[in-house]
Amino acid sequence: MALDRDDLLDQVTDHVLEHGLIGLSLRPVAAAVGTSDRMLIYHFTSRDALVSAVVARASERAIREVAAIPGAATVRSGVNRLWAAYQDQPLSRCLDMYCQAAATGLIGREPYLSDARASNEVWAASLREYFIRCGAPQRRVARIVTLVDSALYGFHLDLTTDRPAELSRGVDDLALAAQAIATG
């Protein structure tokens, strides 16, 4: 049975989340998901378009995960709760893929740049909604998201060399700063 584009994209995204984006080649990916490289090209037109679609699909999944996190009693506890979610699957792998795309220089150039910017806007909106659920005032939530998103991304990168327990104090310091912004 032939897969439609959406099902194929889900399977390729699952494969890339498990095996990584760096060194992605069409033939091995096609074989792993039970199709041919020609079918991937038929559905996605190029390797670049496939990679862009995979990164976007992983971002969609990450956004759904953030939307499912219950609001916390305070912005501080919300930052710590979000950090805990960053360390769990599937969110951790989605963030890893974004890091890999950035590390390979994909996100900073077309055809990825426009898709990455659009995806980042939706990601930031999901974080704004989350922090509003945690009590952040509307007029300050964008500032909180800018700080927290960039910092947690950095902490996530640090997980490659540091243990979560080693980073938790820095994350809580970040959470205190975000709470201070929220309370003005």
Specify the residue positions occupied by each region the protein language model found.
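Short secondary-structure transition hinges
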Residues: 80-128
